[in-house]
Amino acid sequence: MLSPKRTRFRKQHRGRMKGKSYRGNCICFGRYALQALEPTWITARQIEAGRRAMTRYARRGGKIWVRIFPDKPVTIRPTETRMGSGKGSPEYWVAVVKPGRILYEMGGVSETVARVAISIAASKMPIRSQFLRLEI
């Protein structure tokens, strides 16, 4: 699963997801893409599940690009612990996704194959998303 090799700080604030994505919102590598329509945190597990689903469906053909990376640690406190005594320990990693962000790109396959593969990956995501085709 994806996670940073090293970070400057172990823990981060939660932050907030205002507005829409102005970076990473156009197709750069492949011909087809999956674009997020809602703001959310997508975990490293969800990213990997989507990638695997696309790879399995496409078989040998095509290439897949994952355009998001989980670089934000999410901390969780142990259950049934009293309040206080600091922030919990980092449990998993998430990618902060705003509307308009491209999640996956695909190339080297026909549009029908790409459409089905990307729809399978979309079903693994916790948000509404849409299929995009590169207009030439």
Curated annotation (Swiss-Prot):
GO terms for biological process: mitochondrial translation. Its main location: plastid. Keywords: Chloroplast, Plastid, Ribonucleoprotein, Ribosomal protein. Pfam families: Ribosomal_L16 (PF00252). InterPro entries: Ribosomal_uL16 (IPR047873), Ribosomal_uL16_bact-type (IPR000114), Ribosomal_uL16_CS (IPR020798), Ribosomal_uL16_dom (IPR016180), Ribosomal_uL16_sf (IPR036920). Gene3D superfamilies: Ribosomal protein L10e/L16. It comes from the Eukaryota. It is found in: Plastid, Chloroplast. One of its GO terms (cellular component) is chloroplast. GO terms for molecular function: rRNA binding; structural constituent of ribosome. Part of the 50S ribosomal subunit. Belongs to the universal ribosomal protein uL16 family. PANTHER family: 50S/60S RIBOSOMAL PROTEIN L16, LARGE RIBOSOMAL SUBUNIT PROTEIN UL16M. This is Large ribosomal subunit protein uL16c. It comes from Oryza sativa subsp. indica (Rice). The gene is rpl16.
